[in-house]
Amino acid sequence: MSFIERLAPLRTQPGTRLTTGLDDATLTALADRHPQLVAAVDAAAAEFARVQGELGPLLAQDEQAQIEAMQDGFVNFYADDAVTPYVALAARGPWVVTLKGAVLYDAGGYGMLGFGHTPDAVLEAMSRPQVMANIMTPSLSQQRFI
């Protein structure tokens, strides 16, 4: 099964999509040179299989309704037109796969520090005990970072 075919369970869900992502021909052309793209699709397929029973009827909803359901109860201080028009399901490096199966290239915003989504080095560092302090509290981890 090709990595594109692994997106079928996500893409065959009913509901209007807001985000289409990159077309399959482009994704196929990029796959050999971007292993994180394939890893993102694999992660999305696995995560979808894991949450499918839990999300149930939400999967059939329009993408806008899914967005609203995910953010229900949160205060989002961004303007409505600045909220991304999808629910992110999984990501690796700069590649994001939406709940509706769109694949996007996201080079990141604040907080990613150039590492992308789900960076192995950051996850490994976070798996060890860390002093939870900001810049006002000098710590060994600050020096290690530089």
What are the roles of these predicted feature ranges?
Residues S2-R92, G109, P129-V131, S141:
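Active-site-adjacent loop/helix segments that line or gate small-molecule/cofactor pockets in enzymes
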Residues Y86-W95, M112-S127, T137-I146:
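A structural motif shared across PLP-dependent enzymes of the aminotransferase-like
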Residues T98:
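Acidic surface patches and DE-rich sequence motifs
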Residues L104-Y105:
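Generic structural signal for well-ordered beta-strand positions
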Residues A133-I135:
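Short secondary-structure capping/junction motifs at helix and strand boundaries
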